[in-house]
Structure formats: structure tokens, C-alpha cells
């Protein structure tokens, strides 16, 4: 039987103790991080109630198996399926979604490297650069970058997208980007998987659009609220709206029945006046008193104003329809012209 070095046994034991001490256990790939950014990340993780421990993949695997068996957590052992690259164990009190967001927010820009794939579109902005005239101008122009010399400096004529997200950096483009001081890459801890309460989360699950989910929750709340109000289901959130709805319904019934209260009297009188004016319109003018004539005149003026407003709205709609028809005719003409 091969002898196992004491330091390996000790390392596995320490890793196992870390895993036992925190509710959330994550695997991260640290292989892309230089030493200094990695030390900064360690500090940030400590400040946010967590610890990062980098070790050999085989020792991490042994530690996870050990804890899974000791605590009777078979799902935890499945975490070893995600070990790859230069793995490290990150233990924390942050839930998996907050952890993913934390790691994404703390990624840092890095210089261009030939063969590396960019995480997002790379744009060379328009304007003067710090570069002096030289062969780089021709190199830029050969790659479709509109560069020229102005006032003794290389100037970019317009914003130019030189790489789309996911595309590889060529050696020639890497030289240009580095000369311009553009850092198209990112370095950070790459999350491989996270374990919490018997569930393993992968990055694709954790990468959610917060604004979209907040909007969905708001809509769901409003639908539930409206349903609860409509079926008169009282809760601290709906009771006020239910009472208001009941009051308005009761008031409408009372007004319809002519039942006089301090809440209904003005509506009942208003309803009676409208009925009276409707009747007065059918009578000869010489039998009406002056007050009734004034009311009828005021009502007529309001009606005329409403009709004029409706005509304006109809005219605007007709103009819009004419514009749309003209556009359709123009498109039809072009189609006929070009077959």
C-alpha cells in the first residue's frame, strides 16, 4: 500500500472542516487569475463572510467525499463531478444566487491574449489616441479600423467593433488592442458549481435577469391581489380595497334605489337633475322656467365641446391611416419595380 504524505492527510482534514463549517460550498476555477488579483479576491471573500482555499483537485475530491459520507449527504458528493481546471473551494454564508452575482461583479479587466475568446463585443472608440505615427496605422487599416494621422497622433475616425462576444483574439489584433490600452478580457473566479441544502446549482441556473424576475413577481402579486379583492378574501394587503369596493357597490345600489344618506344624497340629486333635463328637452321652450333653460343651455354647450373634441380625434386617426396607406403604396411600388 502506497504511503500517503502527512501534509496531504492534513490538507484533506482542513478542507473537510471548512466544508462542514459553512452552509454553502462552491467550486471555483482559479487558473485564469494572476497572483495579485487572486489575493484581492481572497480578501473580498473574507470581508463577505466566506473563505477561499486553493488545493489540488484530488485532495478537494477526497475532502468532499469524506464530508458527504460523515454527514450522510449523498448530494454533496455529486459536487466532485464539477471539479476541473485549477479548482478551489469557496465556502460562504451567501446564498448561491448572491454568490454568483458577487463573483460576477468582482471580475477585473485584463489585457488581450492571442487565442483568448472575448466575453463581450470589443469596440475601439472614435477619437485621438496616444500612439505616434508608424506601421500600426497600416495594420489598423488592414483590419478595417478607420485610422489616420491627425496633429501628429493616430486618430480613430469612428467607433469600430473589432470583435463580437465569443470570438477569438488574433495575434495582430492583440498587439493593436494592447497598444491602445484596451483590455477586452476579464479575470475572476469562474464558478463551477454550488451546493446548498441538498441541491447543486450550476452557473447557467444562477445567471438570472433580476429586473425580469422582479417584474414577473410584481405582475404575479397584482394578479393575486386582484383575485383576492374580487372574491373578497381578506388579508392585511387586501382588506382596505375590499372595503372600498363593498362601499362603492353598496352606494351604487342605494343611489339606484333612491335611498338617501349623506354619502348618496349628491349622486341622487345629480341623477334626478339629469332625468329632469332629459324630460325638459321634450317640452316646448315657452313652458320652461329660466333656471331650466340655463341648465339646458349649459348642457348643450358641453355636448358641442365633446363633439368637437371627438371630431379632432377622428381627424388625427384619419391622418395616421392616410400616412400608413401612403407608406404601403410606396412599398408596393418598389416591390413592383424590382420584381
UniProtKB/Swiss-Prot annotation:
Keywords from the UniProt entry: Ribonucleoprotein, Ribosomal protein, RNA-binding, rRNA-binding
Compositional bias ranges of the Acidic residues kind: 319-330
Disordered as annotated region, ranges: 307-339
SUPFAM superfamilies with a match to the protein in the record: Ribosomal protein L10-like
Superkingdom: Archaea
Single GO MF descriptor: large ribosomal subunit rRNA binding
Ribonucleoprotein listed as a keyword: yes
A GO cellular-component term linked to this record: cytosolic large ribosomal subunit
HAMAP family, sorted: Ribosomal_uL10_arch
Subunit structure: Part of the 50S ribosomal subunit. Forms part of the ribosomal stalk which helps the ribosome interact with GTP-bound translation factors. Forms a heptameric L10(L12)2(L12)2(L12)2 complex, where L10 forms an elongated spine to which the L12 dimers bind in a sequential fashion.
Family membership: Belongs to the universal ribosomal protein uL10 family.
NCBIfam families listed in its UniProt record: PRK04019.1-2 (NF003096), PRK04019.1-5 (NF003098)
The protein's name: Large ribosomal subunit protein uL10
Natural source organism: Pyrococcus furiosus (strain ATCC 43587 / DSM 3638 / JCM 8422 / Vc1)
Amino acid at each position: 500500500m502506497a504511503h500517503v504524505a502527512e501534509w496531504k492527510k492534513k490538507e484533506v482534514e482542513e478542507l473537510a472542516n471548512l466544508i462542514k463549517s459553512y452552509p454553502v460550498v462552491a467550486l471555483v476555477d482559479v487558473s485564469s487569475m494572476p497572483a495579485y488579483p487572486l489575493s484581492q479576491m481572497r480578501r473580498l471573500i473574507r470581508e463577505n463572510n466566506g473563505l477561499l482555499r486553493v488545493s489540488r483537485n484530488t485532495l478537494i475530491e477526497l475532502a468532499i467525499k469524506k464530508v458527504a459520507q460523515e454527514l450522510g449527504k449523498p448530494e454533496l458528493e455529486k459536487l466532485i463531478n464539477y471539479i476541473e481546471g485549477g479548482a478551489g473551494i469557496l465556502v460562504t454564508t451567501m446564498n448561491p444566487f448572491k454568490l454568483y452575482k458577487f463573483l460576477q461583479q468582482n471580475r477585473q479587466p485584463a489585457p488581450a491574449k492571442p487565442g483568448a475568446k472575448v466575453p463581450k463585443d470589443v469596440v475601439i472608440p472614435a477619437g485621438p489616441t496616444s500612439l505616434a505615427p508608424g506601421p500600426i496605422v497600416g495594420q489598423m487599416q488592414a483590419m478595417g479600423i478607420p485610422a489616420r494621422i491627425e496633429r501628429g497622433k493616430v486618430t480613430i475616425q469612428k467607433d469600430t467593433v473589432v470583435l463580437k462576444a465569443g470570438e477569438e483574439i488574433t495575434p495582430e489584433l492583440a498587439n493593436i488592442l494592447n497598444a491602445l490600452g484596451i483590455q477586452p478580457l476579464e479575470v475572476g473566479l469562474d464558478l463551477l458549481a454550488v451546493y446548498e441544502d441538498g441541491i447543486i446549482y450550476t452557473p447557467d441556473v444562477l445567471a438570472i435577469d433580476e429586473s425580469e424576475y422582479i417584474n414577473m413577481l410584481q405582475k404575479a402579486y397584482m394578479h393575486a391581489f386582484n383575485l383576492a379583492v374580487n372574491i373578497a378574501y381578506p388579508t392585511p394587503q387586501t382588506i382596505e380595497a375590499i372595503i372600498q369596493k363593498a362601499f362603492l357597490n353598496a352606494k351604487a345600489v342605494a343611489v339606484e334605489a333612491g335611498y338617501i344618506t349623506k354619502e348618496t344624497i349628491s349622486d341622487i340629486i345629480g341623477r334626478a337633475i339629469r332625468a329632469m333635463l332629459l324630460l325638459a328637452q321634450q317640452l316646448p321652450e315657452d313652458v320652461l322656467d329660466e333656471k331650466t333653460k340655463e341648465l339646458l343651455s349649459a348642457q348643450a354647450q358641453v355636448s358641442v365641446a365633446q363633439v368637437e373634441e371627438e371630431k379632432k380625434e377622428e381627424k388625427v386617426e384619419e391622418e395616421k391611416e392616410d400616412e400608413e396607406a401612403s407608406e404601403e403604396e410606396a412599398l408596393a411600388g418598389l416591390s413592383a419595380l424590382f420584381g
